[in-house]
């Protein structure tokens, strides 16, 4: 029952995977930036004149943590062609969370209209901490407070308790109702990546907190609920564990099954990069394992998250790329070169949350009167990367 847009995106990603071209993606590419707030809504737009070819949002943008109706109303006027229509719908919605879901879907539609492919991850709250709001006037998800950041709160046996009969099943279903409402408002396909990095143990859905069967059961339940009960037919389901698997067999251990997954991937970050380190070698090995698995199962494949991760620098809350003296200025090109020979269609780096909050692409700090851009030291290598014939950005995909 997949929509035409899903079939088109699937065929496109499959085709790109067979070439030596690679789509460059970024989380929150049009809603968070490290560069000047006087320029566009996107650091890559400032640096190279395009949004990224894949743009990720998270459930945190649906619940008001990373994006909100207020932000849409204040930032998208004059930018989004359908602003007036969206603003009217936001103003008519009765609860704040419904307004936020409308805004997140509108941002996604803006990204799609500008040539990007959408993906949605879920940093879900720990459902043992979710409180009821007492609001029973409208949609189920208005009855719960899903805000805050608790995916790394590891108590509560949450994976078992969100299944039918469990203590948190009703709250989990309400959360999925919110995801479904978002899906129904998106005009196009969404690569939906729930319960990611499940082979590590830093989220409550991680390997230490549920057995293989429970993980598979929760993943299948999620797909069946959205697809069969909520009639969501514009999702492509992405299984995106960490990079722990040392073999195809190990990669398969928590895989939910071919009937529940359209794309497989992995998340792998380059920690404290140095010239001559083994990251690209290890990354290529992991990509080969995932690619082999994908070919055996007839699935799409991608690098679902990557980026550089440095020890937190003085004055920073989080450090991804360094502000200066990065040892691998051509990092984005290095990853493109590692991915291009595989069947992977894209790689996605994480969000530019701010200069002190972690950024994964260079950015512009100011533009001089003569048009000269001043900013992060990796701008020139990134412009070269953008200009490669085989790097794909949104501008290359726009109809």
Q: Where on the chain are the PLM-derived regions?
A:
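Aromatic-lined carbohydrate-recognition surfaces of secreted/lumenal glycan-active proteins
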Residues: 26-27, 193-196, 219-249, 298-311, ...
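Substrate-binding cleft of secreted/luminal carbohydrate-active enzymes
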Residues: 18-29, 36, 299-399
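Alpha-helical scaffolding within the catalytic cores
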Residues: 8, 35-44, 103-105, 243-255, ...
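Structural preference for beta-strand elements that scaffold enzyme active sites
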Residues: 21-23, 54-56, 115-121, 189-193, ...
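Substrate-binding cleft/loops of secretory-pathway carbohydrate-active enzymes
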Residues: 39-42, 239-267, 314-323
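Substrate-binding cleft of extracellular glycoside hydrolase catalytic domains
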Residues: 67, 72-228, 232
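Boundary/entry segment of secreted carbohydrate-active catalytic domains
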Residues: 1-61
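Aromatic- and acid-rich polysaccharide-binding/catalytic face
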Residues: 55-57, 251-280, 350
């Amino acid at each position: 029952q997949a929509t035409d847009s899903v079939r088109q995106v699937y065929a496109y990603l499959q085709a790109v995977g067979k070439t030596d071209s690679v789509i460059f993606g970024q989380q929150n590419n049009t809603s968070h930036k490290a560069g000047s707030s006087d320029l566009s809504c996107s650091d890559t737009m400032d640096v190279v004149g395009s949004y990224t070819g894949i743009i990720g949002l998270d459930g945190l943008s649906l619940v008001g943590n990373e994006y909100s109706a207020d932000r849409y109303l204040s930032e998208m006027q004059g930018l989004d062609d359908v602003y007036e229509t969206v603003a009217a719908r936001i103003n008519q919605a009765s609860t704040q969370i419904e307004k936020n879901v409308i805004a997140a879907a509108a941002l996604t539609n803006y990204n799609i209209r500008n040539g990007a492919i959408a993906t949605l991850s879920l940093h879900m709250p720990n459902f043992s901490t979710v409180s009821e709001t007492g609001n029973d006037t409208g949609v189920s998800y208005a009855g719960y407070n899903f805000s805050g950041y608790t995916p790394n709160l590891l108590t509560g046996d949450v994976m078992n308790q969100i299944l039918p009969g469990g203590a948190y099943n009703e709250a989990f279903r309400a959360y999925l109702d919110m995801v479904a409402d978002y899906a129904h408002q998106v005009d196009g396909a969404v690569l939906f990546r729930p319960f990611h990095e499940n082979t590590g143990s830093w989220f409550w859905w991680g390997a230490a907190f549920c057995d293989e069967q429970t993980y598979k059961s929760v993943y299948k339940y999620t797909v069946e609920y959205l697809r069969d009960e909520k009639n969501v037919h514009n999702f492509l389901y992405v299984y995106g564990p960490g990079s722990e698997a040392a073999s195809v067999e190990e990669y398969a251990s928590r895989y939910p099954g071919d009937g529940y997954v359209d794309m497989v991937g992995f998340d792998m970050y380059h920690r404290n990069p140095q010239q001559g380190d083994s990251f690209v070698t290890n990354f290529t090995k992991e990509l080969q394992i995932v690619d082999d698995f994908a070919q055996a199962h007839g699935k799409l494949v991608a690098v679902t998250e990557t980026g550089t991760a440095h020890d937190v620098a003085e004055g920073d809350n989080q450090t991804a790329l360094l502000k200066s003296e990065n040892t691998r200025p051509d990092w984005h090109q290095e990853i493109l070169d590692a991915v291009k020979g595989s069947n992977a269609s894209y790689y996605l780096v994480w969000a530019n949350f701010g200069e002190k909050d972690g950024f994964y692409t260079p950015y512009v700090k100011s533009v001089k009167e003569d048009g000269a851009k001043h900013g992060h030291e990796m701008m020139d290598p990134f412009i070269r990367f953008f200009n490669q014939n085989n790097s794909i950005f949104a501008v290359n995909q726009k109809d």
